[in-house]
Amino acid sequence: GLYQRNLTNWDVHTIYENNRTYEEKNNHCINCHNYKNYSTQDMLFHVRANHGGTIVIQNGKAKKVQIKDSTIITAGVYPSWHPTKDLVAFSTNKTGQTFHLYHPEKIEVMDEASDLLLYNPGKNEVKHILRTRNDMETFPNWSPDGKTLYYCNCELDKVLDLETMPDSMIAREIALRYNLIKYSLKKVDFDPQTQTFGEPQMVVDAPAKGKSITLPRVSPDGRYVLYTEGDYGQFHIWHKSSDLWVKDLQADTCYALKPANSKDVDSYHTWSSNGRWIVFSSRRDDGNYTRPYIAYFDKNGKARKAFMLPHEDPEYTLLLLRSYNVPELTTDAVTIPASELRECIYDGDGEKAKYTK
């Protein structure tokens, strides 16, 4: 489910909770919630499996949409709201998973294909930003001025012979070469007035040093790109090698946030609206469950030692047999009732987005 915690006290409120017990006809998953400019006035989240779709909330109203088309790989996946326009950048991913028998990291989640989409909620229209067979693009994130879109990119043709390989073999071959799949950080320029994009540009070539980047997030002042770096792949929540890094766009330098990192997973992250705090998912306590950690980020671009999100009962999080993930910081609370969200989710398939070129 989705929950919100008031960081000024101990209050926890349920935004929406799916079924706690398995129900064949109603079982579904809630994930990938995202907010515009750190506010809940414009927000969205995905529903997977039964009653699937994307729930978009604007002007206090919720609607379900299907961001699908014959040219789109699956549907909208990882989102990022444009800061000034009524637009959302999505990746669209064909994702699967495999299980290791002897590797200490038991699950490997991988994409077999991914592209980038631009969605207009007001018009309910969607189009491609980037659509390629040789590259896998994912995790889009806008700069605060809305003129640059950052994303992660894997040059798949450097790992597989795509010229001769049939599509039906790609997933199997990626699984066999899972530790060779590595992502760099790229960007494209964007003109908000004409809504046109420039050509891809390299920002951080992580594969050149044998690493892989995921989850770029630009700081509110536009100076830093916070990202997660690991040894391979793009689902770093399962990778003990994953750490938080930043790219200082002004100084053109990259460095790890060592005081905040740990020897275990440090993965999904978000900035506070003033750029002085970061919240991220970590498995540093037991290696099994992700828990939210908070770290201060000073004006010189340095992080302080991270601490677990406090609870009134200090043992609550450690004894909870559930994982936290996808932490997001907002300046206001979600106010739409859970009953309205449930009605929106259960009441039909929703409106299909119109595909444009």
Each PLM stretch: what is its role?
Residues G1-K357:
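Sequence signature of WD/YWTD-type beta-propeller architectures
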